[in-house]
């Protein structure tokens, strides 16, 4: 069995599920999952867990993500990105300056509330929102709180001859954030229709785009029996508090027994030497093995 984390550079035109399906065939390994869905048109970092690493991928999805993208002011779409049909057009504000855009972007920092787009996989009454959208049905969407730690403009405002304005941005955000909704809400705050016209995920769970591999690159390495693209399973628990255990505690964990450890953290990544061997969960005053990885 292959175990580890892959820093995959997902290319445009494929779903996150497509990427997993292709890797299963390529690596001849059924136990593969991804950490954090990317829309088909979005490129960038997609953490992939293989083998035992699938048991810790949930702890990677809790980590923050960094995106780089582009906002287009002047019209909105059904999907809130460039792939959708035009819903409405509007003229640009009489006064639209870089200073105004920058000031408005700062109002989205911290904890904010978003309404997920209709074309998303969020479930309402057991059905995904995009299923309602494709059927032409309306449904009340649950608002959710997300965290934005960085939201800044990274290019000058580009005014086009057809009355649009585009600019690039960078955003660092927490789990569950819809960046296309952020682009739409920014436009609304500026008093203009808008959508997200480009997006790439440049970092996720400590993995960066600079060190990511495409499916083609991975296929080429596998054909040469080169597996250096596979990161240790320990990358999957990098954001959890670490606790080094001794041989006696290792034996106790292997039998599923509770341990008394000097910590108050709700979850611990238990290490024996340099290897993660379990995820421990605090129960009363002791730690119970939640996931044993040996």
Swiss-Prot record:
GO biological process: mRNA pseudouridine synthesis; tRNA pseudouridine synthesis
Swiss-Prot/TrEMBL keywords: Isomerase, tRNA processing
EC number per UniProt: 5.4.99.25
One term of GO molecular function: tRNA pseudouridine(55) synthase activity
Top-level taxonomic group: Bacteria
CDD domains given in the database record: PseudoU_synth_EcTruB
The keyword Transcription regulation is annotated on this UniProt entry: no
Pfam families: TruB_C_2, TruB_N
Coiled coil keyword on record: no
Substrates-to-products reaction catalysed: uridine(55) in tRNA = pseudouridine(55) in tRNA
Residues annotated as the enzyme's active site: 39
InterPro entries: PsdUridine_synth_cat_dom_sf (IPR020103), PsdUridine_synth_N (IPR002501), tRNA_psdUridine_synth_TruB (IPR014780), TruB_C (IPR032819)
UniProt family annotation: Belongs to the pseudouridine synthase TruB family. Type 1 subfamily.
Protein role: Responsible for synthesis of pseudouridine from uracil-55 in the psi GC loop of transfer RNAs.
Matches recorded under PANTHER family: PSEUDOURIDYLATE SYNTHASE TRUB1 (PTHR13767:SF2), TRNA-PSEUDOURIDINE SYNTHASE (PTHR13767)
Name the UniProt record assigns to this protein: tRNA pseudouridine synthase B
Organism the protein comes from: Streptococcus pyogenes serotype M3 (strain ATCC BAA-595 / MGAS315)
Organism lineage string: Bacteria, Bacillati, Bacillota, Bacilli, Lactobacillales
Designated gene of the protein: truB
């Amino acid at each position: 069995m292959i175990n580890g984390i892959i820093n995959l550079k997902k290319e445009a035109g494929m779903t996150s599920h497509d990427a997993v399906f292709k890797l299963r065939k390529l690596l001849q390994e059924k136990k593969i999952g991804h950490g954090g869905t990317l829309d088909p048109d979005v490129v960038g970092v997609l953490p992939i867990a293989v083998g035992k690493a699938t048991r810790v991928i949930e702890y990677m999805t809790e980590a923050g993500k960094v995106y780089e993208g582009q906002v287009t002011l002047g019209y909105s779409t059904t999907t809130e990105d460039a792939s959708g049909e035009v819903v409405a057009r509007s003229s640009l504000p009489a006064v639209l300056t870089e200073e105004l855009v920058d000031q408005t972007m700062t109002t989205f920092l911290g904890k904010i509330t978003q309404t997920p787009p209709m074309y998303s996989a969020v479930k309402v009454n057991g059905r995904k929102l995009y299923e309602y959208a494709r059927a032409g049905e309306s449904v009340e969407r649950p608002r959710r709180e997300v965290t934005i730690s960085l939201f800044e403009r990274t290019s000058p405002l580009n005014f086009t001859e057809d009355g649009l304005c585009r600019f690039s941005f960078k955003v660092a955000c927490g789990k569950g954030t819809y960046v296309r909704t952020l682009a739409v809400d920014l436009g609304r705050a500026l008093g203009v229709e808008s959508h997200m016209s480009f997006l790439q995920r440049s970092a996720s769970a400590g993995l960066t785009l600079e060190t990511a591999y495409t499916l083609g690159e991975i296929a080429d390495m596998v054909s040469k029996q080169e597996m250096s693209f596979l990161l240790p399973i320990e990358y999957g628990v990098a954001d959890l508090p670490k606790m080094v255990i001794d041989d006696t505690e290792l034996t106790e964990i292997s039998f599923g027994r509770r341990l008394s450890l000097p910590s108050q953290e709700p979850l611990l990544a238990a290490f024996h030497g340099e290897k993660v061997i379990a995820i421990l969960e605090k129960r009363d005053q002791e730690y119970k093995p939640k996931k044993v990885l040996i």
